[in-house]
Regions:
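Core catalytic lobe of class I
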Residues: 2-208
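Short functional hotspots where side chains directly engage DNA or cofactors
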Residues: 209-213
Length: 213
């Protein structure tokens, strides 16, 4: 099996293409991930800061990428971040491999990235799939959490750990997998809850950031 980039009692990080590493990982209870959207995103927020493009974020490459990843996933729950112009494809493709359970809405409270000449998106969507069930009382499908402040952001599309912790805590998952790990927010959330976490990231700089978290 490929040697981990980093490993401790709770977290294992692999540096590489998830399509190469996923076949080497056994079943997990939860896949929680934010894959490339396919929008060629380049952050231009802040002078001289955060201008690097996201790897594999071209539309055709991204679509081909996640379609090749889905058959490799073996999980009870899948929570898959997406956006308004990508979710129909995600819904259809994810539904070929897992029973679909619905869409969650992340209400950010303020507009996010996008074309400044049109409406600013203040939400993201999360496709929920799998045979598993939530733990405890039934929650609503709208999650209200502010975005990570730009000054503390370590990845262009970083998600708040508090929100990810809420999602992980609601599912009976001893092991959480994020095949598009980014800066490791999902792994941080899982570790804080005492869960095992596996992350895969193609860019080494983000593996290093995640390992330090």
């Amino acid at each position: 099996m490929s040697e981990p980039y980093y490993s401790d009692d709770h977290v294992t990080i692999y540096h590489g293409d998830c399509r190469d590493i996923l076949p080497l990982i056994g079943p997990v209870e939860l896949v929680l991930t934010d894959p490339p959207y396919g929008i060629n995103y380049v952050s231009n927020s802040g002078a001289g800061r955060g201008t690097a493009p996201i790897t594999n974020d071209g539309a055709r490459l991204s679509l081909r990428l996640y379609r090749s990843v889905l058959p490799l996933l073996d999980a009870d729950h899948v929570l898959w971040f997406t956006r308004w112009d990508a979710w129909p494809d995600v819904w259809v493709d994810l539904g070929q491999w897992f029973p679909m359970r619905g869409l969650l809405v992340w209400d950010k409270g303020s507009p996010g990235m996008g074309d400044l000449r049109h409406w600013g998106p203040s939400y993201e969507l999360i496709a929920s799939a799998g045979k598993g069930q939530i733990v405890g009382s039934r929650d609503g499908s709208v999650l209200r959490y502010p975005t990570v402040a730009p000054a503390g952001r370590q990845h262009p599309t970083e998600k708040p750990v508090e929100m990810l912790s809420h999602l992980v805590a609601k599912l009976d998952a001893s092991t959480v997998l994020d095949p598009f790990m980014g800066s490791g927010s999902t792994l941080r959330a899982a570790k804080d809850l005492g869960r095992k976490a596996i992350g895969i990231e193609i860019e080494e700089r983000y593996c290093e950031i995640a390992a330090k978290r």
